[in-house]
Amino acid sequence: MSVEAYGPSSQTLTFLDTEEAELLGADTQGSEFEFTDFTLPSQTQTPPGGPGGPGGGGAGGPGGAGAGAAAGQLDAQVGPEGILQNGAVDDSVAKTSQLLAELNFEEDEEDTYYTKDLPIHACSYCGIHDPACVVYCNTSKKWFCNGRGNTSGSHIVNHLVRAKCKEVTLHKDGPLGETVLECYNCGCRNVFLLGFIPAKADSVVVLLCRQPCASQSSLKDINWDSSQWQPLIQDRCFLSWLVKIPSEQEQLRARQITAQQINKLEELWKENPSATLEDLEKPGVDEEPQHVLLRYEDAYQYQNIFGPLVKLEADYDKKLKESQTQDNITVRWDLGLNKKRIAYFTLPKTDSGNEDLVIIWLRDMRLMQGDEICLRYKGDLAPLWKGIGHVIKVPDNYGDEIAIELRSSVGAPVEVTHNFQVDFVWKSTSFDRMQSALKTFAVDETSVSGYIYHKLLGHEVEDVIIKCQLPKRFTAQGLPDLNHSQVYAVKTVLQRPLSLIQGPPGTGKTVTSATIVYHLARQGNGPVLVCAPSNIAVDQLTEKIHQTGLKVVRLCAKSREAIDSPVSFLALHNQIRNMDSMPELQKLQQLKDETGELSSADEKRYRALKRTAERELLMNADVICCTCVGAGDPRLAKMQFRSILIDESTQATEPECMVPVVLGAKQLILVGDHCQLGPVVMCKKAAKAGLSQSLFERLVVLGIRPIRLQVQYRMHPALSAFPSNIFYEGSLQNGVTAADRVKKGFDFQWPQPDKPMFFYVTQGQEEIASSGTSYLNRTEAANVEKITTKLLKAGAKPDQIGIITPYEGQRSYLVQYMQFSGSLHTKLYQEVEIASVDAFQGREKDFIILSCVRANEHQGIGFLNDPRRLNVALTRARYGVIIVGNPKALSKQPLWNHLLNYYKEQKVLVEGPLNNLRESLMQFSKPRKLVNTINPGARFMTTAMYDAREAIIPGSVYDRSSQGRPSSMYFQTHDQIGMISAGPSHVAAMNIPIPFNLVMPPMPPPGYFGQANGPAAGRGTPKGKTGRGGRQKNRFGLPGPSQTNLPNSQASQDVASQPFSQGALTQGYISMSQPSQMSQPGLSQPELSQDSYLGDEFKSQIDVALSQDSTYQGERAYQHGGVTGLSQY
């Protein structure tokens, strides 16, 4: 696949993993394909006796295609009464006999293959029913074959993975008879864990599970060689000696089913286990939600699109969590310092392997501190009991124990420990708050300023400068001095109603955010609201803001009040305890702590006093910090916040961001990095419709240019070179030198002493993890352990090393492998953090080891494909990075090909034993230059529902290619201050001009500070808008005629030769769909048409007026076609 697949102008074919994005083939049986000369395909099922059925006379029945042809020829010769028109009876009979004799086609059996009743053991997907080829799923009670058909793995493996089943039985008439596959040693039946070892003495194989049986030496027979252990499922198929793979001919004869149909069928089976493929065609099945848009007509349309997506995610989350009930739980009881009962328990070990349930609870259900769990006693030794508590401890590398603090310990059977059951208590609070915010945005005029309202909906609005007194010194007290790009960011943000700050890894965005909050608070416009999607991010920012000396209140959810954090002393509930101004409240609090309960009168008085104290603290605070969803807390409901800052906004969904925004935002600052991982959306349907794209991303695509922080202080300069060039256009400067990043007392032999990095070539094979939904690679795990041991021996401390991998299966396997197989003390390995790449976002370690896992022939590299995941992985380390992977599999993907070529050029692609590494001789295809776009990182926005093609039309105001002078508009619109030179001239040359109304204007001279530019910064009316939600008009107040009907409109220009075609994009009520020869559908607006009768002067006025619209190109749209290539490293 060419690298240009990442470029917006790419016309190359991009082949996707079917597991990542299933492709649906053309519907060749649709009505437009009804040709009378064609016969129906063999897989079409029709009722017996019907057309093509047994005894039927149709095209698919006995005789098949030939029957149709014979009938046609006979009709030409036989009249309506059946009498031969030429009277030559004998000749006609002879010809007819000859025609009938020619009808013995081999397809006879094939055509009736699916019209007859299939045996009960036929594959539920494709109908193949050879007993040697099929396997019975013990959970779903269905049969599946071991053939791939049109999918990336065999049908049985596809089903097991999608349905989360793990136990199978072979067919009684198959070569191995009716066999339940299970571990010879422990009886484990999870086929994803099972493998075989050939017994040396006998001609038999022994089935053993991967962990622990195949790896425990004490359990081994003298004839077993555990190094020979291989999984039963390889390349997503059962081994052919175990379950035969149907022949190619059999698979072609079978019913053809696509991966997308399989997905839909599996979803349907959850509701109706007896559903068939035919049921998928019924109306109402699998209705897709409406996709998110780039622009919205008004907030009602916005709510009508996002509301259903939030509900979809809520329903999915509820279903998932409420289905996870666990029995046979053993509880260990304890008493907390606050006199509340704490129950400790571990999830039971199952046949699926000991990490399976932990994976589901941590990854799928995202179990975290503060979640509610219901604990029930089901035994006979005490009365039946039920209690609800909040999670205060989750499983980690040290153990799988979960701890919950009970709300009330009344009746708790603390004397018994067995026969408990746990249920996850699903709470709709966060989803309710999102829905409420969407509604408020639509109906409440005071929820946000007019300017922000229109900007968020994508309307064109005159830019404004906020009237404020800029500080003489931008660095905040108690915080480090700012660099030039941070100063520019602070200075610009303070004067803008809406700002985006892009903070690449290690560029100090937390310090910048804290400084901005400090100056906003000093302006005295009431408390500043600071939010982030996660509690960890909120705590980090709260800590930094506190260092400036401001009065900060950290608002926690009530369910998290018992959880300790570095900023607990700033939490609202703890500050209330220390309020000297309310002695009565302190007295009642002390009584409650000692006795655990208060009388009803005292409790009522206590709550009233507490509410008063909370209100007083919140009103007098300079800054209030909480999560995005926490901003919907009733305690903030009556407060209005003029200034709101959302950190890590690229990790929040759009409705999540709206929860704080609707609390009166007049100045909104979004901080994040759209070149790193985006929000997590569990429901695939909602994610596909666009819920997985952040507000920050959409605003970037709309043309609001983020201010980028440009000096990184984390990585050794050698480590930052590749991410800077590939993800940030070479704009990152190093705030640390190579000498700053050499560890004292650390003696590790890097292949190149001045470059603390290498790619360790590993030839292992991937295996499906025990959960069936993840992967692991045992060879890579062994190499990771060796590298970790070498780092420890060289002088690194365990807590300075981070091991990251994209796959939960590998993370879990690594934790176990390090414990059982590490050559050093177990405690050392326990202190080494092992986590998924996604969980490590926002974190850093001195040394990072990345295990890539994927190594196969057919499956691709899964979500290693997401370049943002690679960006996060490569930018976590301060002193050194080691990548362990299979270059052959990875190099097929363009970005990884770049990385591998880069490592090879730097002579750090190595193989061989660790104590004698040598340069690898592997060769890769030469990478092409990645296309440089207007929107840095836009080519990596895999979650984007639309791309930034609007912003990269060659010859437009955006273009600065080397094929000619920039357009004259460039000099009028480019802000020279906006992009601070990154040093090397070739990098500076890649600065891309921005449309005038979206750029941060040059700072006005001191005498003009504080003056508004254009409409007041409050509720402005957008260009062409009659007011909030009003119908859009053109610049001259006239409704614009439909553009495609005008002879001189953009749609009528013949630009078919240009390589920028894009599907139709509907934006609000404006239909953007345009003819196929139009190379930029969606880029022109019907309201902004150029009428043919307009004189040149009038047209030029329109051109100037509309040149400030981010989508308008005028007659400059296609001056030339090139796009600047990205400068290499």
From Swiss-Prot:
CC per GO annotation: chromatin; chromosome, telomeric region; cytoplasm; cytosol; exon-exon junction complex; nucleoplasm; nucleus; P-body
Record: residues binding Zn(2+) 1: 123, 126, 145, 155
Positions of Zn(2+) 3 binding: 183, 186, 209, 213
A Pfam family the protein falls into: AAA_12
Residues covered by region (Sufficient for interaction with RENT2): 1-415
Biased composition (Low complexity): 1073-1086
Region Disordered, residue ranges: 39-70, 1009-1058, 1073-1096, 1110-1129
Protein modification: Phosphorylated by SMG1; required for formation of mRNA surveillance complexes.
Binding site for ATP: 486, 506-510, 676, 713, 844
Keyword Cytoplasm: yes
PROSITE patterns xref list: UPF1_CH_RICH
UniProt-recorded Gene Ontology molecular function terms: ATP binding; ATP hydrolysis activity; chromatin binding; double-stranded DNA helicase activity; helicase activity; protein-containing complex binding; RNA binding; RNA helicase activity
Biased amino acid composition, Gly residues: 52-69
Family: Belongs to the DNA2/NAM7 helicase family.
Protein name: Regulator of nonsense transcripts 1
